[in-house]
């Protein structure tokens, strides 16, 4: 009888549930947005909190640089000053819709939706 009880206890312990002791991994992604001559491409991006947008900036056809200026919205990332070349990342941590413009080129704008 003792052997049966011990075997039952060992079997029950082996069938126990997972304690969830594994560390969850982050699955944040990065999305590239390109500042073309007079447009952002893509000009609409939908991401999750913690994701990164990499703004790829190159000179416009006339040699002018670009800026990325976000509307004054709570949670918006820092603006990007006028630059000629570079890949400038911005991490979006807050949920919401974040509209941005290039003031060097009127009409050049985009939106990031974080949900």
Predicted feature locations:
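Extracytoplasmic copper-binding redox domains, predominantly the cupredoxin/blue-copper superfamily
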Residues: 15-115
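Sec-dependent bacterial lipoprotein signal peptides
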Residues: 1-14
């Amino acid at each position: 009888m003792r052997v049966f009880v011990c075997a039952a206890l060992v079997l029950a312990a082996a069938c126990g549930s997972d304690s969830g002791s594994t560390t969850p991994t982050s699955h944040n992604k990065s999305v590239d947005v390109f500042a073309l001559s007079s447009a952002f491409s893509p000009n609409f991006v939908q991401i999750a909190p913690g994701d990164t947008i990499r703004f790829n900036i190159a000179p416009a056809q006339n040699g002018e640089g670009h800026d990325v200026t976000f509307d004054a919205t709570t949670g918006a990332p820092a603006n990007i000053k006028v630059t000629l070349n570079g890949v400038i990342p911005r991490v979006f941590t807050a949920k919401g819709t974040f509209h941005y413009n290039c003031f060097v080129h009127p009409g050049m704008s985009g939106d990031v939706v974080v949900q």
